[in-house]
Amino acid sequence: MALSDSIGDFLARIRNAQLAMHKTTRVLFSKVNSSILKILKDEGYILDYQKEVVGNIPSFVVKLKYYERSPVISDIVRVSKPGCRCYSKYKDISKAYNGLGIFIISTSKGVMTDYDAHKLKFGGEILCRVF
């Protein structure tokens, strides 16, 4: 069966693994997922990730992060969906949760946070919201 929304599946796997208090989870490999994982690591939402090939299928193993036995990622939501894309100009990008969270945006210059997109004056598709 083909996967229609790889980013949605990726976010659901991370959300479900954190709610179940797993130390690691496995997500499918893609360039967009790689960019999102890099942002999550740089922003301190996950410990680490590495590429792994199992049975000729590439995937990422993500080490999840917890603080005082509760997940660091309390909310990770897909904003732009395959049936309803959500685009924003750089002027219209607001801060997620009054600056406590981030939006991850796909721009013409790659995937970046809302802060970086606003600083570089790039708009784009809002992929997800992380808090």
Curated annotation (Swiss-Prot):
CC annotations in GO: ribonucleoprotein complex; ribosome
Key words of the record: Ribonucleoprotein, Ribosomal protein, RNA-binding, rRNA-binding
Classification via Pfam families: Ribosomal_S8
Example GO molecular function: rRNA binding
RNA-binding recorded as keyword: yes
GO biological process terms on file: translation
UniProt key word Ribosomal protein: yes
Transmembrane segments: none
Taxonomy, superkingdom: Bacteria
NCBIfam families tied to this protein: PRK00136.1
Family: Belongs to the universal ribosomal protein uS8 family.
Protein purpose: One of the primary rRNA binding proteins, it binds directly to 16S rRNA central domain where it helps coordinate assembly of the platform of the 30S subunit.
PANTHER family reported for this sequence: 40S RIBOSOMAL PROTEIN S15A (PTHR11758)
Quaternary assembly: Part of the 30S ribosomal subunit. Contacts proteins S5 and S12.
Protein name per UniProt: Small ribosomal subunit protein uS8
Organism: Wolbachia sp. subsp. Brugia malayi (strain TRS)
